[in-house]
Design a protein with these regions (language model features):
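Bilobed "Venus flytrap"/periplasmic-binding protein-like clamshell domains
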Residues: 1-66, 160, 175, 179, ...
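Residue-level signal for pocket-adjacent positions within structured domains
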Residues: 7, 13, 111, 116, ...
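Pocket-lining segment of extracytoplasmic ligand-binding domains
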Residues: 10, 47-139, 143
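Residue-level detector of anion-binding/catalytic polar loops
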Residues: 22-24, 70, 199
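N-proximal short alpha-helices
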Residues: 33, 37, 121-128, 162, ...
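Generic signal for short, ordered secondary-structure residues
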Residues: 43, 130, 171-172
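An extracytoplasmic/periplasmic, membrane-proximal ligand-sensing/linker region
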Residues: 55, 59, 65-66, 76-94, ...
Length: 204
C-alpha cells in the first residue's frame, strides 16, 4: 500500500502540492521508488518539478522529522511499524490519491484501491484513499503441476494462520488473489483456481 506522508504542520494537502518540493521517493530501484514515480507522473509531476531524494526508510524518516524533505513515499503494508514509529517522532498526515488519478493508475499499472482507516496511525484521524500493489508468490515453471497445486492449496488452507503472523490485513481470498495479476499463472495454480470456479491465464 502506498503511503504518502508529510508533516502535520505542512501546507501540503494533496499530491499536487508537491510541485517544487523535496520528496524522498525511496531507494534506487525499489518498489517505493517505482510507485512514487508512477504516482507523481499520473499527477503530471516529473523530476524537474519535484526534487527527488533516494533515502532508505530510516533516512527518510529522519529527513522528514528534520525538515530536509517535505514528503516521503513508502510502499508498505497497513499498520506498518515504520509509519507508526515515524508518527511518534513527529505529527504526520497522509495524503489521499484522487479517484481520477487512482483510476488512471489502475488502468495503466493494475494498482488496486486501498484505504487507510482513520486512527490507523498515531494522530491520523481521517480515512485516506490510496492505491496498493499485490504481493505475488513466484515459482519456477519447472515445478510440477502437482507441487504447485499443493502449494497454492496450502496457502489458502492456512490463511487464518498466516494472518496471525502479521498485523496487516492479508485478505487471503481466492477471487481477490487473482485480481490485477498480469503475469501468467503456473498450470498447477490454474488447476487449483479452476476447481474453485476461477479461470486464470497460463503461459501455455
Amino acid at each position: 500500500m502506498c503511503h504518502i506522508i508529510v508533516r502535520a504542520d505542512s501546507d501540503i494537502n494533496s499530491v499536487h502540492d508537491l510541485l517544487g518540493k523535496t520528496v524522498s521517493v525511496g531507494e534506487e530501484e525499489s518498489g517505493s521508488q517505482l510507485n512514487a514515480k508512477q504516482i507523481l507522473s499520473a499527477y503530471g509531476l516529473n523530476e524537474k518539478m519535484v526534487k527527488e531524494e533516494n533515502f532508505n526508510y530510516a533516512d527518510s524518516a529522519k529527513a522528514l522529522v528534520s525538515g530536509e524533505v517535505d514528503a516521503l513515499f513508502w510502499t508498505v503494508g497497513i499498520n506498518a511499524t515504520v509509519v507508526e514509529e515515524l508518527s511518534r517522532q513527529c505529527d504526520i498526515k497522509l495524503l489521499s490519491i484522487d479517484k481520477e488519478v487512482s483510476d488512471k493508475l489502475k488502468s495503466a499499472y493494475s494498482y488496486i484501491d486501498c484505504k487507510v482507516d482513520g486512527n490507523t496511525y498515531n494522530g491520523q484521524t481521517k480515512d485516506v484513499n490510496t492505491v496498493g500493489v499485490k504481493s505475488v508468490l513466484i515459482v519456477s515453471d519447472r515445478l510440477s503441476n502437482d507441487k504447485v497445486k499443493a502449494l497454492t492449496k496450502l496457502v489458502f488452507d492456512n490463511a487464518n494462520e498466516l494472518q496471525l503472523t502479521v498485523s496487516a490485513d492479508l485478505d487471503i481470498i481466492e477471487k481477490d488473489a487473482v485480481t490485477g495479476v498480469n503475469i501468467p499463472f503456473h498450470s498447477g495454480a490454474a488447476e487449483y483456481y479452476s476447481e474453485k470456479g476461477i479461470e486464470v491465464k497460463t503461459a501455455e
